[in-house]
């Protein structure tokens, strides 16, 4: 029988089989072909399949050990976190307590807690209690004083107040003071509003009588310009003696004649003085106001020149301002000598007892006393223009 080639030849021919190391080294001592055939009949795949079979139990054991150790680690993790969080909370609490005690020590006086002295927590709390008791006794907030206050007040204590104060006194007093201040502020606001309303109403009610109030003063002066002539006194048709003194300027359109009195009554004559070149007239004071003597306004040079240029007739007498009257024997009309001014007068001058030379003119003099004269219309002495039907009086500027 032919012997099987040595294993070296097999290794040379089939090097790819043994290169993987599949366990053929145990069959190198076999000399029988059957054994070789048996050995060759056994496929290396079977050996490969049989060898890894013991490995799964080892892997499973390792996985079981790892699974057994993993829950232990997971169980120990939360316990350590809880211990750490508890310690952190304790540290935070101690820090907060130390901060609060340090803040409390700041309010203690140096006599109780000197600056360089270290105090424990218990000592700090005891000193604070003593200091608070001392302040309560000084301020009258002791238990005895509070009981006396409660007895005095009884059940009438107000529910409002400071919750920290036992008697709720300071807060209640402050609340009452605020309520009083608000009430006073509202009363003042209402009083101011009423005062403004009353002031406006009085101003509107007294506005029509403003001219009369101004004219009732001791002296007055006419303004520089006016839109037109104002009305004459209310009692025009009664008589000259009852009328209030009032003044009219000379050169004003729609002007009315001043009040005149008879020649015989000199004491009751009113003073009629033309103001300083005012183109409008002032209304006389109302009858309800008492007459007040007026101060004659100074006549200007222009008015003096105008009055000097006027010629008069001897029959009626017209007194303007305080001029000296020089009558003329012949009846003449008033003719202006100043250009731009036109005078037309239907009244006549009343002659005095003594006639003087012709060419008489008005002379303005501030120092001369006022003379009384009356303006007589044809046949009707001491009457106003409105009471006469045939008389005409027109002054144009």
UniProtKB/Swiss-Prot annotation:
One GO CC annotation: chromatin
Entry-linked Pfam families: HLH
Keyword annotations of the record: Developmental protein, DNA-binding, Dwarfism, Notch signaling pathway, Nucleus, Repeat, Transcription, Transcription regulation
InterPro entries (UniProt xref): bHLH_dom (IPR011598), HLH_DNA-bd_sf (IPR036638), Mesogenin/MesP (IPR040259)
Feature: compositional bias, Polar residues: 258-270, 365-375
Sequence ranges assigned to domain bHLH in this UniProt record: 81-135
Biased composition, class Basic and acidic residues, residue ranges: 235-244
Signal peptide per UniProt: none
Keyword Transferase: no
Main subcellular location: nucleus
Entry superkingdom: Eukaryota
Gene Ontology molecular function: DNA-binding transcription factor activity, RNA polymerase II-specific; protein dimerization activity; RNA polymerase II cis-regulatory region sequence-specific DNA binding; sequence-specific double-stranded DNA binding
Biased composition (Low complexity): 32-48, 58-71
UniProt xrefs under Gene3D superfamilies: Helix-loop-helix DNA-binding domain (4.10.280.10)
Sequence repeat placement: 179-180, 181-182, 183-184, 185-186, 187-188, 189-190, 191-192, 193-194, 195-196, 197-198, 199-200, 201-202, 203-204
Gly residues bias locations: 180-206
Xref: PANTHER family: IP14615P, MESODERM POSTERIOR PROTEIN 2
Name the record gives this protein: Mesoderm posterior protein 2
